[in-house]
Structure formats: C-alpha cells, structure tokens
C-alpha cells in the first residue's frame, strides 16, 4: 500500500490540514460540496488518502468542526490568485507635491498647473506648497490669493480637500481628484 504524505506549509490563515486535525469528530464534506456525514477525524483522513486529496478544516468553530476534502495546494494557489486580483483592483492614492514661491512668474505657474492636472488625471492628490523665504512671510495674503487662483484653475479636475493654511514657513493646500 502506498501512503501519500504531502509536505504542507500553513499559510497566514492557519489552516489545519491532514494529521494536524486533532479533533475526535468532524463533519466531512467532499470536493463537490456534498455532506458525507459526521465521523472520526481518522476515518475522514483515511477517506482523503484513498481519494488522493487533503483533509482541510474549514470551519474550526463549529461543533463538530467542518472539514472538506480538497487539493490543498490548488486551493492555496486559488486563494493567493484572488488576493492578487483584489490588490490590483485597489487604487493606491499618492500625494504629489508641487512647490512654488509667492512671487512665481506666469509661465512657471502654467507649468506647475499642467503637472497638477496630470497628477489629478492619474488619480493622485496634489499638495500645493508655497515656501516663504526671509521677509516674504509678511505677505501671506499674496500666497493665499495665488493658491485660490491655482484651485480655481483646477476646478474641473479636482476639489479642494484642505483649504490654504500656514504650516511653519509654508502655506499649503491639498486638492483631491474628482470622482469619475
């Protein structure tokens, strides 16, 4: 008689597989989802060996625990595949920063505006920072007007998430992309 023993590594979900199941009785379900019945864990393991499958405890908190006959390696592969698909569907929102001085020229302002539009179209938030040097800090109203003008230009691409505010020697504002 050939005994198949698989080397199974327990992943982060801590499944109990084959010999690791120490319960006296288990409720057994076959690979098609049909209930076989309540039996000892040893009998269930023997059935799994006969069918060249693994015995996996899927509901440990039930009384008796529910075990299923399945190819555990294939099951783990499908789980990891589903997790990767879920990660791909999640959109990671980055915050891109654009720095300006309070006395920026019109052409430079346009260049910064174009890069902000690109960031917002990509789905990233834009943090606009105006840095004050020396005596420039006395003219915060100019910087606030500049940020409001910047927000007005970007109105069709994004909304102001955080209004212009002082943070040390910087004035900043955050613009979030519009939902599609």
From Swiss-Prot:
Gene3D superfamilies: Translation initiation factor 3 (IF-3), C-terminal domain, Translation initiation factor 3 (IF-3), N-terminal domain. It is found in: Cytoplasm. PROSITE patterns: IF3. Keywords: Cytoplasm, Initiation factor, Protein biosynthesis. GO terms for cellular component: cytosol; membrane. InterPro entries: T_IF-3_C_sf, T_IF-3_N_sf, Translation_initiation_fac3_CS, Translation_initiation_fac_3, Translation_initiation_fac_3_C, Translation_initiation_fac_3_N. GO terms for molecular function: ribosome binding; translation initiation factor activity. GO terms for biological process: ribosome disassembly. Its main location: cytoplasm. IF-3 binds to the 30S ribosomal subunit and shifts the equilibrium between 70S ribosomes and their 50S and 30S subunits in favor of the free subunits, thus enhancing the availability of 30S subunits on which protein synthesis initiation begins. Monomer. NCBIfam families: infC (TIGR00168). Belongs to the IF-3 family. This is Translation initiation factor IF-3.
């Amino acid at each position: 008689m050939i005994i198949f023993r698989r080397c199974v590594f327990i992943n982060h979900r801590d499944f109990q597989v084959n010999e690791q199941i120490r319960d006296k009785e288990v409720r057994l379900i076959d690979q098609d989802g049909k209930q076989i019945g309540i039996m000892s864990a040893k009998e269930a393991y023997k059935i799994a060996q006969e069918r060249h499958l693994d015995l996996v405890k899927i509901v440990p908190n039930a009384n008796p625990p529910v075990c299923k006959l399945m190819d555990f390696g294939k099951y783990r592969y499908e789980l990891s595949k589903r997790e990767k698909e879920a990660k791909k569907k999640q959109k990671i929102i980055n915050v891109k920063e654009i720095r300006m001085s309070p006395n920026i020229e019109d052409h430079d302002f346009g260049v910064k505006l174009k890069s902000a539009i690109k960031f917002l179209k990509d789905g990233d938030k834009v943090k606009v920072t105006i840095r004050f040097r020396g005596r420039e800090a006395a003219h915060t109203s100019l910087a606030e007007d500049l940020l409001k003008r910047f927000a007005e230009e970007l109105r069709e691409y994004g909304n102001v998430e955080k209004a212009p505010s002082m943070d040390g020697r910087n004035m900043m504002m955050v613009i979030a992309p519009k939902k599609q």
